[in-house]
Amino acid sequence: MFELQPSSIVVLVFCVLAIKVCISLIGKTTIQDRIWYLYTIGASKAGHSKFVALAQKREELVRVNKERRAISAQDEYAKWTKLNRQFDKLNSEVNDLAEATSSEKAQISKLVNLAIAATTTAPIWFSRIWYRKVVLFYLPPKVFPYYIEWVLALPFIVTGGVGLTVWMFALNSVLSSLEFLIKFYLEEPVKKPEAPAASEAQTKQ
């Protein structure tokens, strides 16, 4: 039932590990927050009272905030103060409604974690067990010394072949390096430290 060609196993494992790296780059918390946001929208459209009220309050909060930012506190102080009080009140109501739905948010987060595990961790462990003796491909004769071929065949493959264990190790190494480079590129550059002022330098002397 679960028998696959070696080429299909190679592609399957690559896709699963690539998804795992993408999830790591995005972050589980970010994914949970986005799915929760979509869930609240869907629940409000479905008529869930708490989420309907939460969606309405959020829309009103955004509207009041735009109005508040559009006027000057100095020129229209009375109107700005009124909007500011209204904003604070709405913000408090939104927080209260969000807390009222916290139990449902926890359930959604749990389901997201289960979905991530089912998408990444479960297929990897299943493949390690089910396809542990499958030779994914064979090395050309005498490309490596015998002891290297023997190591690459560990722990279940005949010498000269490459199995899932070594293939996954190689893929993880490449994808981890790629993940590091992407994170490094996306991080904000560190500013060059400023040279100490002349007075500070003299003081130290």
Swiss-Prot record:
Residues 30-116, 179-205 are cytoplasmic. Pfam families: CHD5. GO terms for molecular function: protein-membrane adaptor activity. Disulfide bonds: none annotated. Residues 1-9, 138-161 are lumenal. GO terms for biological process: tail-anchored membrane protein insertion into ER membrane; vesicle-mediated transport. The keyword Transport applies. Residues 53-103 form a coiled coil. It is a multi-pass membrane protein. HAMAP family: Get1 (MF_03113). Required for the post-translational delivery of tail-anchored (TA) proteins to the endoplasmic reticulum. Together with GET2, acts as a membrane receptor for soluble GET3, which recognizes and selectively binds the transmembrane domain of TA proteins in the cytosol. The GET complex cooperates with the HDEL receptor ERD2 to mediate the ATP-dependent retrieval of resident ER proteins that contain a C-terminal H-D-E-L retention signal from the Golgi to the ER. Belongs to the WRB/GET1 family. This is Golgi to ER traffic protein 1. It comes from Clavispora lusitaniae (strain ATCC 42720) (Yeast).
